Protein backbone atom coordinates (compact mmCIF):
# COMPACT_ATOMS: atom_id res chain seq x y z
CA UNK A 1 0.00 0.00 0.00
CA UNK A 2 1.44 3.36 -1.02
CA UNK A 3 0.75 6.74 0.48
CA UNK A 4 -2.43 8.12 -1.04
CA UNK A 5 -1.57 11.80 -1.00
CA UNK A 6 1.31 14.02 0.02
CA UNK A 7 -0.45 16.59 2.14
CA UNK A 8 2.48 19.01 2.15
CA UNK A 9 2.48 19.20 -1.65
CA UNK A 10 -0.89 20.92 -1.46
CA UNK A 11 -1.19 24.60 -0.44
CA UNK A 12 -3.91 23.98 2.14
CA UNK A 13 -2.18 20.86 3.43
CA UNK A 14 1.14 22.68 3.72
CA UNK A 15 -0.44 25.56 5.67
CA UNK A 16 -2.16 23.11 7.96
CA UNK A 17 1.06 21.17 8.44
CA UNK A 18 3.01 24.27 9.45
CA UNK A 19 0.40 25.30 11.98
CA UNK A 20 0.08 21.74 13.27
CA UNK A 21 3.85 21.66 13.71
CA UNK A 22 3.74 24.93 15.64
CA UNK A 23 1.29 23.43 18.12
CA UNK A 24 3.75 20.56 18.59
CA UNK A 25 6.40 23.05 19.70
CA UNK A 26 4.18 24.25 22.55
CA UNK A 27 3.99 20.69 23.88
CA UNK A 28 7.65 19.84 23.20
CA UNK A 29 8.78 22.96 25.06
CA UNK A 30 6.47 22.32 28.02
CA UNK A 31 7.44 20.99 31.45
CA UNK A 32 5.92 17.59 30.64
CA UNK A 33 8.90 15.19 30.73
CA UNK A 34 10.18 14.34 27.25
CA UNK A 35 10.15 10.61 27.98
CA UNK A 36 6.51 10.86 29.03
CA UNK A 37 5.72 12.75 25.83
CA UNK A 38 7.24 9.99 23.71
CA UNK A 39 5.68 7.13 25.72
CA UNK A 40 2.24 8.73 25.40
CA UNK A 41 2.76 9.43 21.69
CA UNK A 42 3.78 5.82 21.12
CA UNK A 43 0.82 4.39 23.06
CA UNK A 44 -1.76 6.57 21.31
CA UNK A 45 -0.24 5.56 17.97
CA UNK A 46 -0.33 1.86 18.90
CA UNK A 47 -4.00 2.08 19.88
CA UNK A 48 -4.83 3.85 16.61
CA UNK A 49 -2.76 1.50 14.46
CA UNK A 50 -0.65 4.26 12.91
CA UNK A 51 2.51 2.54 11.70
CA UNK A 52 4.13 5.82 10.67
CA UNK A 53 3.78 7.32 14.15
CA UNK A 54 4.71 4.08 15.94
CA UNK A 55 7.90 4.08 13.85
CA UNK A 56 8.68 7.70 14.76
CA UNK A 57 8.12 7.42 18.49
CA UNK A 58 9.79 4.03 18.86
CA UNK A 59 12.92 5.38 17.18
CA UNK A 60 12.84 8.66 19.12
CA UNK A 61 12.64 6.75 22.42
CA UNK A 62 15.49 4.45 21.42
CA UNK A 63 17.57 7.39 20.20
CA UNK A 64 17.10 9.13 23.54
CA UNK A 65 18.53 6.08 25.29
CA UNK A 66 15.28 4.56 26.50
CA UNK A 67 15.82 0.86 27.36
CA UNK A 68 14.33 -1.56 24.83
CA UNK A 69 12.33 -3.32 27.55
CA UNK A 70 10.38 -0.12 28.27
CA UNK A 71 9.76 0.58 24.59
CA UNK A 72 8.63 -3.00 24.00
CA UNK A 73 6.31 -3.01 27.01
CA UNK A 74 4.42 0.19 26.18
CA UNK A 75 1.72 -1.91 24.49
CA UNK A 76 1.31 -3.93 27.71
CA UNK A 77 2.13 -1.22 30.23
CA UNK A 78 -0.60 -2.31 32.65
CA UNK A 79 1.05 -5.74 32.93
CA UNK A 80 4.59 -4.50 33.42
CA UNK A 81 6.79 -3.19 36.22
CA UNK A 82 8.98 -0.79 34.25
CA UNK A 83 6.88 2.39 34.31
CA UNK A 84 6.65 4.92 37.12
CA UNK A 85 3.28 5.72 38.70
CA UNK A 86 3.33 9.09 36.89
CA UNK A 87 3.99 7.38 33.54
CA UNK A 88 1.24 4.85 34.25
CA UNK A 89 -1.21 7.68 34.93
CA UNK A 90 -0.21 9.39 31.67
CA UNK A 91 -0.55 6.14 29.71
CA UNK A 92 -3.99 5.51 31.23
CA UNK A 93 -5.09 9.01 30.19
CA UNK A 94 -3.65 8.41 26.72
CA UNK A 95 -5.63 5.19 26.29
CA UNK A 96 -8.89 6.49 27.70
CA UNK A 97 -8.58 9.76 25.78
CA UNK A 98 -7.99 7.80 22.59
CA UNK A 99 -10.69 5.16 23.04
CA UNK A 100 -13.49 7.61 23.74
CA UNK A 101 -15.94 5.73 21.53
CA UNK A 102 -15.21 2.51 23.43
CA UNK A 103 -15.69 3.88 26.93
CA UNK A 104 -18.34 5.66 28.86
CA UNK A 105 -17.64 8.39 30.01
CA UNK A 106 -14.29 8.57 28.20
CA UNK A 107 -11.59 9.48 30.69
CA UNK A 108 -12.66 8.07 34.06
CA UNK A 109 -12.63 10.05 37.28
CA UNK A 110 -10.14 7.54 38.70
CA UNK A 111 -7.69 8.12 35.85
CA UNK A 112 -8.16 11.87 36.09
CA UNK A 113 -7.40 11.73 39.82
CA UNK A 114 -4.22 9.72 39.15
CA UNK A 115 -3.05 12.22 36.56
CA UNK A 116 -3.79 15.16 38.89
CA UNK A 117 -1.72 13.45 41.58
CA UNK A 118 1.39 13.42 39.39
CA UNK A 119 1.22 16.47 37.12
CA UNK A 120 0.84 20.19 37.74
CA UNK A 121 -1.55 22.32 35.70
CA UNK A 122 0.98 23.17 32.98
CA UNK A 123 2.06 19.55 32.60
CA UNK A 124 -1.56 18.43 32.59
CA UNK A 125 -2.45 20.94 29.87
CA UNK A 126 0.47 19.69 27.78
CA UNK A 127 -0.54 16.06 28.36
CA UNK A 128 -4.16 16.63 27.35
CA UNK A 129 -3.09 18.59 24.26
CA UNK A 130 -0.57 15.88 23.37
CA UNK A 131 -3.21 13.14 23.48
CA UNK A 132 -5.51 15.22 21.27
CA UNK A 133 -2.73 16.12 18.87
CA UNK A 134 -1.46 12.56 18.55
CA UNK A 135 -4.96 11.35 17.79
CA UNK A 136 -5.17 13.94 15.01
CA UNK A 137 -1.72 13.01 13.67
CA UNK A 138 -2.61 9.32 13.72
CA UNK A 139 -5.78 9.94 11.78
CA UNK A 140 -3.86 11.87 9.14
CA UNK A 141 -1.32 9.06 8.89
CA UNK A 142 -3.92 6.30 8.65
CA UNK A 143 -6.19 8.16 6.20
CA UNK A 144 -3.25 8.93 3.91
CA UNK A 145 -1.67 5.45 4.28
CA UNK A 146 1.60 6.75 5.70
CA UNK A 147 3.64 3.60 6.26
CA UNK A 148 6.06 2.95 9.09
CA UNK A 149 9.68 1.97 8.59
CA UNK A 150 11.32 4.89 6.79
CA UNK A 151 11.64 7.36 9.66
CA UNK A 152 15.16 8.48 10.50
CA UNK A 153 15.97 9.73 13.98
CA UNK A 154 15.57 13.50 14.26
CA UNK A 155 13.87 13.84 10.87
CA UNK A 156 11.36 16.34 12.27
CA UNK A 157 13.64 18.01 14.83
CA UNK A 158 12.48 21.50 15.62
Predicted regions and their residues:
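Hydrophobic alpha-helical segments
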Residues: 1-158
